[in-house]
Amino acid sequence: MSAVTQHHADELARGADELGVALDADKQRQLLAYLALLIKWNKAYNLTAVRDPDEMVSRHLLDSLSIVPYAEAGDNWLDVGSGGGMPGVPLAILFPEKRLTLLDSNGKKTRFLTQVKLELKLANLEVVHSRVEAFRPESPFDGIVSRAFSSLEDFANWTRHLGGQETRWLAMKGVHPNEELAALPEDFRVEAEHALAVPGCQGQRHLLILRCTA
């Protein structure tokens, strides 16, 4: 029996509707196919501590979709420390016209992400196996997103060479990171903060949007 059922499809559709994110049948199919791959590969590759498929829908898929309204601007995005592909893979599915680069230093995780790209035929997705400090793209990214990657200070310092004055840095956090904000480098400023309500998720969720003023 498939690990992904109609129940998960209904949960995804209902949650996306609550978030105001439009999912057509093809995007929903791709997201569920990604979920199936995540469940399958997680057994051997330990991609996420979340094992329950029900929790994966809310804590991974819907959590990723919650930032869709804030990722609409810009055509070239980087998901740094992508891990199992959140939020980069869902963003690549939702925005086929954008280029999504998924960066991770863990070879097992980038092998999984490469398989996702192949099986879901995501031509707009690029997987890079590298440490963030060593990554040197040809041009700055329009947006750089992280989810459970590092402190805000490290996120800013480690990725500043990957952006420019027009770049937005999106940091997905749980509780509001007051102490991390106090340690933010002087040349970074908070452009916006958003409290996110993710269907099926307990606890706080926050999105911080940063700019580099240097």
Swiss-Prot record:
Q: Which Pfam families match?
A: GidB
The answer to whether UniProt assigns keyword Zinc to this entry is no
Q: Which residues bind S-adenosyl-L-methionine?
A: 81, 86, 132-133, 147
Q: Which reaction does it catalyse?
A: guanosine(527) in 16S rRNA + S-adenosyl-L-methionine = N(7)-methylguanosine(527) in 16S rRNA + S-adenosyl-L-homocysteine
Write down the EC number: 2.1.1.170
The record's Gene Ontology cellular component field reads: cytosol
- The yes or no answer to whether the keyword S-adenosyl-L-methionine is present is yes
Query: What coarse category fits the chief subcellular location reported for this protein?
Result: cytoplasm
Report the locations given in the UniProt record.
Cytoplasm
Q: Which UniProt keywords apply?
A: Cytoplasm, Methyltransferase, rRNA processing, S-adenosyl-L-methionine, Transferase
Q: Which GO terms describe its molecular function?
A: rRNA (guanine-N7-)-methyltransferase activity
- Family, per entry: Belongs to the methyltransferase superfamily. RNA methyltransferase RsmG family.
Q: What does this protein do?
A: Specifically methylates the N7 position of guanine in position 527 of 16S rRNA.
- Protein's name in the database: Ribosomal RNA small subunit methyltransferase G
Q: Which gene encodes it?
A: rsmG
